[in-house]
From Swiss-Prot:
It is an enzyme of class 1 (oxidoreductase). This is Sulfhydrogenase 1 subunit beta. [4Fe-4S] cluster 2 binds at C312, C315, C318, C322. It comes from the Archaea. Residues 222-254, 303-332 form the 4Fe-4S ferredoxin-type domain. The keyword Isomerase does not apply. It is found in: Cytoplasm. It comes from Pyrococcus furiosus (strain ATCC 43587 / DSM 3638 / JCM 8422 / Vc1). Gene3D superfamilies: Alpha-helical ferredoxin. InterPro entries: 4Fe4S_Fe-S-bd, 4Fe4S_Fe_S_CS, Helical_ferredxn, NADPH_Sulfhydrogenase_Subunit. Keywords: 4Fe-4S, Cytoplasm, Iron, Iron-sulfur, Metal-binding, Oxidoreductase, Repeat. Part of a bifunctional enzyme complex that functions as an NADPH-dependent hydrogen-evolving hydrogenase with sulfur reducing activity. May play a role in hydrogen cycling during fermentative growth. Activity not exhibited with NAD. The beta and gamma subunits form the sulfur reducing component that catalyzes the cytoplasmic production of hydrogen sulfide in the presence of elemental sulfur. Not active in the presence of sodium sulfate, sodium sulfite, sodium thiosulfate or cysteine.
Length: 367
């Protein structure tokens, strides 16, 4: 990998030059507590030391709402509507959000590529930035706190500038086109980088092993936590909309006022909505709020056997923005036995039966 240094005094000039490559988006402060990725007119408004944006960068690639095709019911045909996307740059993406995009890639690009997602992914330039964790961050436990790839450039803060890692041919071109703004990395810079990474690791609130989380979630399907926390849940879906990896959508046909023409659109859906598991005939795969609440925890941490990865990147958004003050990481730690001295007796006695039946998909009195 190639490493260069961008001196602090050249930062804004480099950011300004990025606009020559397309629209520039970066984190800006939108209120006392909140940040969001917005199009940048004035590069001096960019926030380099933000904790997290409300919406993850997935919104640029997987649109909250988009038209798929148009139709005319008088004709046996339809016309696909694929947006013409101009190149764009997203600056200031944290490592956990980069991992989030990589997970979305496994869903929308592997096997059967989604053309709507793909066209945006091909046009987007990703520039990551280092960060210090706050009390909500647990990306270190998900091993998503340091990005090895998935970016064109990655900026690591130094006392007098940035150590820049170059991750793609596009990243090389960005540096080479502006080579006069960059310098070689010195021994002093390497020491500063090492010191920053050491302090960053020490700043995390939690330092523990979550390696058996998936299995404990499968075993603890009736843990009392599910009832307690589901009762608090407002089923608003904000944990889904702010999540970097939530990818469910619903599809609807919209007929225009002429009653003949229309279009099909897809829009983000939430597994916390009752309608999410509702199918023809009125059957609902997850009829209760508890079912839906528990399903999200399983989706993020247990439904990953095929890909061998967690669908949670530890960004902390679902906890930080939850209006009911439900702690996602706190609930997982309860399942892991890290926030309670011992399991309730009724739970520990039934674990062997429930665990075997659940994991093996076997049901019956003899299990």
């Amino acid at each position: 990998m190639r490493y260069v240094k961008l001196p602090k005094e050249n930062t804004y000039e480099f950011l300004e030059r990025l606009k020559d490559w397309g629209k520039l988006y970066a984190p800006v402060k939108i209120s006392d507590k909140f940040y969001d990725f917005r199009e940048i007119d004035d590069v001096r408004k960019i926030e380099f030391h933000y904790n997290r944006t409300i919406m993850p960068p997935k919104k640029f690639f997987f649109k909250p709402r988009e038209k798929l095709f148009e139709f005319d019911i008088s004709k046996p045909e339809y016309r696909e509507v694929i947006e013409e996307v101009e190149p764009f740059i997203i600056f200031g993406v944290h490592a956990c959000d980069i991992y989030g995009l990589k997970i979305l890639d496994t869903v929308y690009l592997d096997e059967f590529p989604d053309k709507y997602y793909k066209v945006r992914r091909e046009k987007g330039i990703i520039i990551g930035i280092s960060c210090m964790p706050d009390e909500y961050c647990f990306c270190n436990l998900r091993e998503t706190d340091f990005a090895d790839d998935g970016f064109d450039l990655f900026f690591h803060e130094l006392p007098d500038g940035w150590l820049v890692r170059v991750g793609t041919p596009t990243g090389h071109r960005l540096v080479d086109k502006n080579i006069k703004l960059f310098e070689e990395v010195t021994d002093k810079d390497i020491c500063a980088f090492r010191d920053f990474e050491k302090r960053r690791q020490q700043a995390f609130k939690y330092h523990e092993d979550w390696g058996n989380l998936r299995y404990l979630l499968e075993l603890e399907m009736e843990h009392p936590m599910w009832d307690e926390e589901a009762d608090k849940c407002l089923a608003c879906g904000i944990c889904n909309t702010t999540c970097p990896t939530c990818r469910c959508y619903e599809v609807q046909d919209i007929v225009n006022l002429d009653g003949v023409t229309g279009y099909r659109e897809r829009r983000w859906d939430s597994c916390q909505f009752r309608s999410h598991g509702l199918v023809a005939g009125g059957h609902n795969f997850r009829p209760t709020k508890k079912d839906r609440f528990r399903n999200r925890y399983l989706c993020k941490n247990a439904y990953n056997e095929k890909l061998g990865l967690s669908y949670c990147v530890g960004c902390g958004r679902c906890t930080a923005f939850c209006p009911a003050n439900i702690s996602f990481v706190g609930n997982l730690r309860r399942i892991l036995g890290l926030e309670e001295n011992k399991c309730p007796p009724t739970v520990s006695e039934e674990i062997p039966k429930r665990g075997f039946a659940y994991s093996s998909n076997i049901r019956g009195d003899g299990v």
